[in-house]
Design a protein with these regions (language model features):
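Glycine/aspartate-rich loop-and-adjacent alpha/beta segment that forms the canonical ThDP
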Residues: 151, 159-227
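Active-site metal-binding loops of divalent metal-dependent hydrolases
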Residues: 94-97, 124, 186
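Single conserved hydrophobic/aromatic residue that forms the stacking wall/gate
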Residues: 230-238
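Cofactor-binding active-site loop characterized by glycine-rich and histidine/acidic residues
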Residues: 1-112
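Short, glycine/polar-rich helix-capping loops at beta-to-alpha or helix-loop-helix junctions
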Residues: 135-143
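A short alpha/beta connector and helix-capping loop motif
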Residues: 102-125, 181
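Active-site pocket-lining segment
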Residues: 118-130, 143-148
Length: 238
C-alpha cells in the first residue's frame, strides 16, 4: 500500500504500452483519483502512453522500450538477494516483446543466479502490432526457451482466468532455487465481439458507437462486473 516501502513487492510492466490497464488498477487501489483516468494522454497529464515512475505513485519502473523491463526486474530481484530482503518482483512481457534479444540475456542471468524471487509473466495472445507473432518473428516454443535458462515454467491454459492466475502465483511462490516464467495464453480483446483476436485493435481507441457496443458485450459476459471484491480474494497469493 505504501509505494515507497523498502520491502514492498515490485511490479514492472515491461510491455509499457499497456499502461491504461496498470493505471486503472492503481486508481482502484487508491494511488491516485479515479477521475484522473479521464486525462489519459492529455497534454500536461501525468498519465501518458507509457508509465513514468517519477510522476505516478505505485509505478516501480518507467517502461516502454520493449525488452528493457525484464532487465530492470532482474536487477531488483538480485538486489533483494544481495541485501537479504524477502520482497518479490513481478514483470509482465508481451509475446511480441520477447523477440528482443535483451529479454534472453536477462533470462539467462536470472536463471544463472537462481533468482527465485522473480516471476516473469508472458502475455501470449499471439498478436503484435505488425500481425501474428509467429509470422513476424516466431519466438516459439516460449516455455522451452525459459526452461533452457533454468526457469520453472507454468503453462497457463487460460490467461484470462483470474483463478488460474492466482494458482500460478501460488506455485511460483513455492518454487525455490529458480525463477518462474508463467506463459499465459490469452485472447486479445477478450469479451468484446469486434475486438477479439483482431490485430488492428492493438493500438487504437474505439469511437463512441464502438465503445457502447464494447460495454454492452462486456456486460453480457459479466466481464464489466468483475469486481475488485473478487480480485481481492487473491491479494495474499503474491
Amino acid at each position: 500500500k505504501n509505494p515507497k516501502k523498502p520491502d514492498r513487492d515490485r511490479f514492472v510492466l515491461s510491455k509499457g504500452h499497456t499502461a491504461p490497464g496498470l493505471y486503472s488498477a492503481l486508481a482502484q487501489r487508491g494511488y491516485f483519483p479515479v477521475e484522473d483516468l479521464k486525462t489519459l494522454r492529455h497534454l500536461g497529464s501525468y498519465l501518458q502512453g507509457h508509465p513514468d515512475m517519477k510522476h505516478i505513485p505505485g509505478v516501480d519502473m518507467s517502461s516502454g522500450s520493449l525488452g528493457q523491463g525484464i532487465s530492470a526486474a532482474v536487477g531488483m530481484a538480485l538486489s533483494a538477494k544481495l541485501t537479504n530482503d524477502d520482497y518479490r518482483v513481478y514483470t509482465l512481457l508481451g509475446d511480441g516483446e520477447i523477440q528482443e534479444g535483451q529479454v534472453w540475456e536477462a533470462a539467462m542471468f536470472a536463471g544463472f543466479r537462481r533468482l527465485d524471487n522473480l516471476v516473469v509473466i508472458v502475455d501470449n495472445n499471439g498478436l503484435q502490432i505488425d500481425g501474428p507473432v509467429d509470422q513476424v518473428c516466431s519466438p516459439y516454443p516460449i516455455g522451452e526457451k525459459f526452461k533452457a535458462f533454468n526457469f520453472h515454467v507454468i503453462d497457463l491454459k487460460d490467461g484470462n482466468d483470474m483463478d488460474q492466475i492466482a494458482d500460478a502465483f501460488k506455485e511460483a511462490r513455492n518454487t525455490k532455487g529458480m525463477p518462474t516464467a508463467i506463459i499465459a495464453h490469452t485472447v486479445k480483446g477478450k469479451g468484446v465481439s469486434f475486438m477479439e483476436n483482431q490485430v488492428g485493435w492493438h493500438g487504437k481507441a474505439p469511437n463512441d458507437e464502438e465503445y457502447a457496443v464494447a460495454m454492452e458485450d462486456l456486460r453480457k459476459e459479466g466481464e464489466a462486473s468483475v469486481s475488485y471484491t473478487h480480485l481481492r480474494a487473491h491479494e495474499t497469493v503474491l
